[in-house]
A protein has these predicted regions:
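Accessory cap/linker subdomain of secreted extracellular hydrolases
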Residues: 28, 43, 108-112, 120, ...
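C-terminal, loop-rich substrate-recognition/catalytic regions characterized by aromatic stacking residues
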Residues: 28-30, 251, 338-599
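N-terminal cap/lid segment of alpha/beta-hydrolase-fold proteins
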Residues: 39-84, 452, 456-458
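Cap/lid segment of the alpha/beta-hydrolase catalytic domain
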Residues: 79-160, 489-490, 518, 566
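Short glycine-enriched nucleophile-adjacent loop
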Residues: 177-189, 470
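Short beta-strand/loop motif that positions the catalytic acidic residue
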Residues: 297, 303-305
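Conserved alpha/beta-hydrolase "acid-adjacent" motif
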Residues: 310-315
Length: 599
């Protein structure tokens, strides 16, 4: 992926969302097609009987009187809109449903090119500007507010009763547009029959304060981006707005939008209350709170994510907690990458089954598909009947004298010490995939401590959720601890595999009230915060983002610990910088637990 300024690439990704998606080729209705329905491949079960579409736009008024801008795409034959009642698939858009850029109009079909094939197969496609954004009226109150969720219900039901609708509605979209699907499902709208959230999250607190550490750089960038989109870079007006006065009036309301960065900076704990709204944002505006309601909805849910995306942990947890009809696919992607799979085929298989009643076999397949990074291309995609994989062996790799191995320490007094280097960083959040790659990590590793295995005698597959157990002390009252899992090749170059992080004062654990796959749950309540006693060791349990990686024979596995991640986290800087000590003695052993597959 080419490098470019982060802000510009984020803006382009959010507004145009032009990603490298494979588009299923349309099959003429006169051509007999072999029936194929397997993971990533689909033909012969439904035909591309339409040859085009028409776009229209209008306002729809929701329950509180707010007008939302809606784009509708309806299939055509020989230029004539079909009179057939068809299923509808829609997205609740935060980054403008349509815009004009350098004289060209961009719509949702540019963001998701495979939707053109969905239209040809007999679906109505819709995109709706969220309140306070695009051409919609209203005010942005914060991410996934109660009003936004009300809107999702109202739009779903409006789409379900239109004369051109079959009454069966689905949802699609990635990132913010995936969160909104979970929240829509939690309201159980009668016409919502299937959702397909891509790279979406479940726990807002873990997104903003992962391990209790503020992810400020990204949320500040995001807030600036949406401010520009909402106020300075207007969306395309709806058809009825011939003179642009409606759009101008909507943008005037957007000027009262709240800043997400201002909201979250003032809410450092899971139970923090937003002063302006009186809401516990991390409780009331986040999907994980509504697991019970989403389960009760029974709405079929296809979860899709990437190993190098920031939300992959959440998607795996959601999948395991839902008893809805469900599927989980995890590929070799960051937040914005989309290769190695025909996304259009998977969406069409899902919607044909649930919105048209076509028995294409998708529900008889293994429910989990995952890509093993580093495996031969022919065998990289694999399937399983459950997540985590039933075949995983939780294997402890103990920290030694710069070594990492499977033999527990027996000596006493063993420890490693370093001074926090606040310049440490991997890259400006490469998990978003917005122009920043994962660099070679040797220089980064030198700013902390590393422990490395000998060269592997054979390949080792790690598929699942790594967990670090560290005994750590500090010369200060707190510490931000960043843990990295890496693969080191024969030349000594180190490649990023995964990471986890935890503020030491946020180390308390509790029962989350749902299945967290055996991972540590740090509740992050204000009352849970416990400062360190200088030079007194405490145990930290830190889960890393899940991965599926084949460590090659001859390569080495490395664990690195640093005390900062400058580009991605707001770690308070102290002078002098504190010393951190990682203990690895018999009574206070530290280790990395890896989910090893096979021998």
């Amino acid at each position: 992926m080419t490098r470019r300024p982060f802000r510009r690439s984020l803006l382009l990704a959010a507004t145009l969302a032009v990603v490298s998606l494979r588009v299923s080729a349309a099959v003429p209705s006169s051509q007999k097609t072999e029936k194929v329905s397997t993971f990533g491949k689909y033909s012969g079960y439904s035909e591309a009987v339409y040859d085009g579409w028409v776009r229209s736009s209008r306002y729809v008024t929701v329950r509180d009187g707010t007008r939302l801008a809606v784009d509708l795409f309806r299939p055509t034959r020989k230029g004539k809109v079909t009179a057939e009642k068809l299923p509808v698939v829609w997205t609740h858009h935060r980054y403008q449903r349509a815009l004009r850029e350098k004289g060209k109009v961009y719509t949702i079909l540019d963001s998701f090119p495979w939707l053109a094939d969905v239209l040809r197969h007999g679906y109505v496609v819709a995109a709706v500007d969220a309140r306070g954004s695009g051409a919609s009226f209203g005010r942005f109150e914060g991410m996934f507010s109660t009003h936004e969720t009300d809107d999702a219900y109202d739009i779903t039901e409006w789409l379900g009763i239109q004369p051109w609708s079959s009454g069966k509605v689905g949802m699609y979209g990635r990132s913010y547009l995936a969160f909104t699907q979970y929240l829509a499902a939690s309201r159980k709208p009668p016409h919502l029959k299937a959702i397909f959230p891509e790279v979406g999250g479940a726990d807002m607190y873990e997104l903003i304060y992962r391990g209790g550490i503020y992810h400020g750089p990204f949320i500040e960038m995001w807030s600036q981006l949406v401010r520009e989109l909402d106020v300075d870079k207007p969306a395309l007006p709806v058809d009825e707005d011939k003179d642009g006065k409606m759009l101008k009036a909507a943008v005037e309301q957007h000027k009262a939008n709240r800043s997400a960065a201002d909201i979250f900076a003032a809410l450092p704990f899971r139970d923090s209350v937003d002063a302006a709204s009186g809401v516990q944002v991390y409780r009331d505006w986040t999907p994980i709170t509504f697991l019970k309601e989403i389960r009760e909805s029974k709405i079929p849910t296809y979860l899709l994510d990437g190993w190098n995306d920031r939300y992959v942990r959440d998607e795996a947890i959601l999948f395991d907690n839902l008893d809805n009809p469900k599927r989980l696919t995890i590929g070799p992607w960051t937040h914005t990458q989309s290769d190695h799979l025909d996304f259009g085929a998977e969406h069409l298989r899902w919607w044909d089954y649930w919105l048209k009643g076509i028995d294409n076999g998708i529900m008889r397949e293994d429910p989990v598909h995952y890509f093993v990074i580093g495996a031969p291309k022919a065998t990289a995609w694999r399937s399983a009947k459950a997540w985590p994989l039933p075949t995983e062996r939780r294997t402890k790799y103990w920290l030694g004298a710069k070594t990492l191995g499977t033999v527990a320490p027996t000596e006493n007094g063993a420890e490693d010490e370093f001074t926090v280097d606040y310049s440490a960083e991997v890259s400006p959040d490469p998990r978003w995939g917005l122009g920043h790659d994962f660099p070679e990590l040797s220089a980064h590793d030198a700013k902390g401590l590393s422990w490395t295995t000998p060269p592997l005698s054979g390949a080792v597959e790690v598929t699942g959720h790594p967990v670090a157990h560290l005994w750590l002390s500090s010369s200060a009252l707190d510490a931000d601890v960043f843990v990295y899992l890496e693969e080191v090749d024969e030349k000594g170059e180190s490649r990023y595999v995964s990471e986890g992080m935890l503020r030491a004062s946020n180390r308390a654990t509790a029962d989350p009230g749902f299945n967290l796959l055996g991972l540590p749950y740090h509740p992050g309540l204000k009352s849970d915060q416990s400062p360190l006693t200088p030079e007194t060791p405490v145990e930290l349990v830190i889960d890393l983002y899940p991965t599926s990686t084949l460590f090659a024979a001859g390569h080495r596995i490395r664990v690195t610990v640093t005390g900062a991640d400058k580009a991605n986290a707001r770690t308070p800087q102290q002078a002098p910088a504190p010393r951190l000590t990682v203990w690895r003695e018999a009574g206070r052993a530290s280790w990395m637990e890896l989910p090893v597959i096979g021998n």
